Amino acid sequence: MKYTINIGLHNNNFSNAVMHINNAKQTGYFDDYHIREMNGIYNGVTEPTMVLTFNTKADITSIVPLIEKWCKQMTQVCIAMQLKDNDNNTFGALIYDRDFRGHQSPFDNKYFLTND
């Protein structure tokens, strides 16, 4: 499956995010990845955003806990994720920090950034 992840960089610096991504790579979540920095929108405000893309055989039950961990490590309320399966079906979600107790917004594809 192909995953695309949007990580906001307002509360998080680029090199710190790359360090956590490299740690996940070293532990076998994926072999290779592509990163691009773009401008996204969060709560109506433009925010520099890391767009991470990787292919993996890991299923979503393995990837969601990784993204929840990244939320905590990268001081993110949530991280947007989209996966594309082998039949080109797509599914998007906002993965929230497990400790977040506020309103959880639904995933909205019009705000999601891709490397395509």
Positions of PLM-derived features:
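Positively charged, small/polar-rich N-terminal and surface patches that mediate targeting and assembly
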Residues: 1-116
